[in-house]
Amino acid sequence: VESGAIDCIWGCFSMDGREEVYRWAGPYMVSRQVAAVDADSSIRALSDLAGKTVAVQSTGKPEEIFLTGSDPRIPQSVEVLSIENRSVQYAMLACGYVDGIAAHETGILQYMKDNAVDFRILEEPLLVTGLGIAFAKNDTRGLDSQLTDTLAQMRADGTLERIIGRYLENASQYLEVDTIGA
């Protein structure tokens, strides 16, 4: 994006920790990064992951959260497997190769729906953040502002909820961007 090869980065791109790196349109949607386990697992809370193995997608927020050790809710004894392809982490949990996974809640829900598997998402999220569209810091075209305005209009007139509702149940909960950090 900085080189101008692409205009923006758009696709489940969380703003958290990147606010000063890019110009942002949004947030347009709430993202919950969560941990999930097999439905029959005895793991009920993040603290129960002590001594367990968790698969995460490489370069994603869950990987950062688990590997930096900066979140006191995450036991230091968790073994983290960083996987390049996120669909592999879901299969690893379904096959019992790992004790848990950490990813976007929406991705986990969609995988469960598409593959008829039963994971249990832990109640306490790893991170609640806004998804946005990132533009280069030196981009002066104003596309970030225009897109922010357009997304706000789409949210106000129900267009975003209708679009998200085609893919996710309870679409309105993903549009509560005003509650992020509250």
Predicted features along the sequence, with ranges:
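Beta->alpha turn/N-cap motifs
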Residues: 4-16, 39, 57-61, 86, ...
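Extended ligand-binding regions for polar small-molecule ligands
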Residues: 40-43, 47-61, 133-172
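Short helix-initiation/N-cap motifs at beta->coil->alpha
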Residues: 41, 80-91, 95, 127-129
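A ligand-binding cleft/hinge motif common to bilobed small-molecule-binding domains
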Residues: 12-21, 65-68, 92-94, 98-127
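Acidic, polar ligand-binding/catalytic clefts
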Residues: 1-48, 120, 125
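Ligand-binding cleft/hinge of the Venus flytrap
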Residues: 25, 62-83, 90, 112-116
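Periplasmic-binding protein-like
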Residues: 29-37, 113-152, 170-182
